[in-house]
Amino acid sequence: MKPTLPTLLILGGCAAAAISLSSCGPSGGEKKEAAAPAASSSAPASGASAAATPANVPAGDLVDITPTYPKPLFVGTPPPSVPIPNLEKADPENAKKMETFKVPKGTTNVAKGKKVTSSDPLPIIGTLDLVTDGDADGADGCYVELAPGLQWVQIDLEKEYNIWKVLLWHFHKQSVVFFNVVIQVSDDPEFKDKSKITTIFNNDIDDKNKLGKGADQNYVETNHGRLIDAKGAKGRYIRCYSNGNSADEMNRYIDVQVYATDAK
């Protein structure tokens, strides 16, 4: 069982967030033109698929996008304090390769500034708009903390898009693993019509979220976030689930960036 965070720590966290002097600066992405690479028949290394040319890319030139990554808040990628099943092996070199990724020309972060809702209507720390402010800084005052257990945040992109990449940052001030991470795309704001739901990431190998068993790996949070290949999935809404973390039962989100083009 994961430990319950004492009430005193929760109250202390609220006070700290209220008086924090840290500021969340803007974060963007640099675009560069890139010719479409030749197709490769070799299988990607673990964790590397998101950096490859996205599947289902329409014909035409691609561009390179290099988001502005926040500074690391710890050195290296130390293992979590408790054993984690299905945990990917840390690969700093692969993380560097994924800093720049290819997407179709015209792709932008369509999530920036969009409305965010949540399964927890009263976050313990922070506000939901932090999830789409474009800033991935892990400092105090730059994240929203939701209640223990299974929770989600949802972004309304306001219209349907072809989604190529999703870049997700949970709390990365410490070396932690967030559990049962599932990311889904849909045109149904309630996510009830299964025929309209596309799951683009799922490391819930035990199906604790009751959303289906996943095949992705657990990973340690870093300043690079987690880059996910959405393969052109169509949808208006993005929902990100988590179920506590390796340090405590809370769910903390910093930023979600959705790189997409108008739906075709």
Model-derived features with residue positions:
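Trp- and acidic/polar-enriched beta-sheet ligand-binding modules for extracellular glycan
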Residues: 54-80, 119-121, 144-151, 160, ...
